[in-house]
Regions:
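N-terminal leader segment of winged-helix/HTH proteins
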Residues: 1-33
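C-terminal regulatory/oligomerization modules of transcriptional regulators
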Residues: 1-7, 127-149
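Charged, amphipathic alpha-helical coiled-coil/dimerization segments
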Residues: 23, 54, 74-134
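Short alpha-helical "packing" element that flanks the helix-turn-helix/winged-helix DNA-binding module
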Residues: 42-43
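A short acidic, leucine-rich amphipathic alpha-helix
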Residues: 57-59
Length: 149
């Protein structure tokens, strides 16, 4: 096997286990907040977004289909972290609004996530991290624009 194909195979083989390991690591860091990684990510994303985003936009940012975000939002809403309201411009759609508790929790989750990333990347050269980020972005673009063989 040519070296470039071996490197590509090695790189892609590591993506899923790395994502799973990172998720487990973040789950442990967020455990004290009594949120799953999915819930914490949704609350953090909502904290970063404009108040009153539509469910569909949150689903898109989470990388899931629209209906898949409903149980997650149910959980977040039951916890008192967010509320859904009818969209004033489209009564069929719902908008999501973080509560005060949701905004506070989003800030805590962001802080813990920042601490985790700082520790994980402390010994990695910034230039190497920039290259790795560019490579991941290029792979993502290639996946979006190419057909499977």
């Amino acid at each position: 096997m040519p070296d470039d194909l071996f490197l590509a195979r090695t790189f892609t083989t590591q993506l899923v286990p790395l994502a799973r390991a990172y998720r487990r690591h973040i789950d442990r860091a967020l455990a004290g907040l009594a949120l799953s990684h999915s819930s914490a990510l949704a609350v953090m994303l909502l904290g970063r977004m404009e108040d009153g985003v539509r469910q569909g936009l949150l689903a898109e940012q989470l990388g899931v289909e629209g209906p898949s975000v409903v149980p997650l939002l149910d959980q977040i809403e039951r916890a008192g972290l967010a509320e859904r309201r009818p969209d004033p411009t489209d009564k069929r759609a719902k908008t999501i609004h973080l509560t005060e508790a949701g905004r506070a929790l989003a800030a805590q989750a962001e802080e813990r996530s920042t601490q985790v990333r700082a520790a994980l990347f402390a010994d990695i050269d910034k230039g190497d991290l920039a290259v790795a980020t560019r490579v991941l972005e290029q792979v993502a673009r290639a996946l979006d624009t190419s057909d499977p063989v």
